[in-house]
C-alpha cells in the first residue's frame, strides 16, 4: 500500500513508522523539509493520512483537491481548544464533514483520533489482553476496507461507527475523553459498564462477540450461599473507580491536548 502523510508531527511519525514496519510504502510531507505536502498527496495513491491540526487541515486539503481526487483520506484531527477542552465545531459540521466538503471527490474516513500519540507507538496496542478498537466513520466501502487494513496493521481492531455524518459523535467523544483524562485526571473507562450489563438486567441481547470485540456476556447477578443476590464484583469495582485517578497527593502532570489525535498545534 502506498500511503502519503500530510504533516510531519507526532501522529505522522507514530502511524507512519507502524505502517513502514508492516511493509507499506510511506512518504510524509510538510511545509518544510525534504518532501512537500503536494508530493505526499501525489504519493498516496492508496491512502493519505491527514496528520494536520484543525482548522489548517481543511484549508490544506482544499488547496490540494486536484491531487487528492479519488483518494482515501484518513482524518485523525480533533477540534478541541481552551482550558475547558471545548469542541470548537460544536453546532456545525464535524472536521471530517468539512474535509469532505473541501475535497468532494475524495473518500474521507474518520479514524485514529481518540488516543494519545504514544498509544499508536505501542507494538501492538493491547490492553488487558485485548487489542484496542478504532472507530471508523466513512461512506465508501472501498475506502473503509483500506482503513480497516491500516488499523489492523497497527495491531488494532477496526470498529465501524457509521457514515461520515456520525464523525461528529466520534469527535465529541474525543473532547469528552480529553476533558476527563486531562482536565479531571479521571479514569474515563469507568463511565461504561462491562458489555454484559450494557442492556439492563437481562444481559441476554444476542450480539456476536466478533462485533463487540469483547468477551461473551456473563450473568448479571450472582447468588451467595444464603440466597441473597449480590452485585458482580467487576461491576462494583467499575462503579468505585469512576472518580478521579489517584488521590489529593497525586502528582500533577501536564498533558498537551494536541497529543490526542491531531490537535491544535500546527505541524
Q: Language model features by range: what are they?
A:
Residues 2, 25, 46, 133, ...:
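Residues at the starts of beta-strands that form the adenosine-phosphate
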Residues 14, 18, 102, 150:
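Rossmann-fold NAD(P)-dependent oxidoreductase module
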Residues 6, 129-217:
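Active-site-lining helix/loop region of Rossmann-like oxidoreductase modules
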Residues 1-39:
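NAD(P)+-binding Rossmann beta1-loop-alpha1 motif at the extreme N-terminus of oxidoreductases
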Residues 77-118, 122-126:
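Rossmann-fold NAD(P)-binding glycine/threonine-rich loop
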Residues 216, 225, 233, 238-242, ...:
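Short linear motifs in low-complexity or flexible loops
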Residues 37-83:
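Rossmann-like NAD(P)-binding element
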Amino acid at each position: 500500500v502506498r500511503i502519503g502523510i500530510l504533516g510531519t508531527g507526532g501522529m505522522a511519525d507514530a502511524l507512519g513508522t507502524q505502517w513502514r514496519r508492516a511493509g507499506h510504502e510511506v512518504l510524509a510531507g510538510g511545509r518544510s523539509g525534504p518532501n512537500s505536502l503536494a508530493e505526499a498527496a501525489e504519493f498516496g495513491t492508496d491512502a493519505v493520512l491527514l496528520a494536520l491540526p484543525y482548522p489548517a487541515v481543511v484549508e490544506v486539503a482544499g488547496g490540494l483537491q486536484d491531487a487528492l481526487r479519488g483518494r482515501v483520506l484518513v482524518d485523525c484531527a480533533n477540534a478541541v481548544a481552551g482550558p475547558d477542552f471545548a469542541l470548537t465545531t460544536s453546532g456545525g459540521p464535524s472536521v471530517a464533514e468539512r474535509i469532505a466538503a473541501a475535497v468532494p471527490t475524495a473518500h474521507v474516513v474518520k479514524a485514529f483520533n481518540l488516543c494519545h500519540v504514544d498509544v499508536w507507538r505501542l507494538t501492538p496496542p493491547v490492553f488487558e489482553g485485548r487489542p484496542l478498537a478504532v472507530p471508523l466513520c466513512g461512506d465508501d466501502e472501498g475506502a473503509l476496507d483500506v482503513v480497516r487494513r491500516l488499523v489492523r496493521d497497527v495491531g488494532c481492531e477496526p470498529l465501524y461507527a457509521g457514515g461520515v455524518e456520525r464523525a461528529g459523535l466520534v469527535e465529541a467523544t474525543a473532547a469528552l475523553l480529553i476533558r476527563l483524562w486531562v482536565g479531571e485526571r479521571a479514569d474515563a473507562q469507568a463511565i461504561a459498564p462491562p458489555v454484559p450489563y450494557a442492556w439492563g438486567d437481562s444481559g441476554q441481547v444476542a450480539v456476536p462477540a466478533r462485533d463487540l470485540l469483547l468477551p461473551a456476556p456473563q450473568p448479571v447477578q450472582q447468588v451467595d450461599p444464603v440466597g441473597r443476590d449480590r452485585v458482580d464484583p467487576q461491576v462494583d469495582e467499575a462503579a468505585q473507580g469512576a472518580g478521579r485517578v489517584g488521590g489529593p497527593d497525586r502528582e500533577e502532570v501536564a498533558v498537551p491536548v494536541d497529543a490526542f489525535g491531531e490537535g491544535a498545534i500546527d505541524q
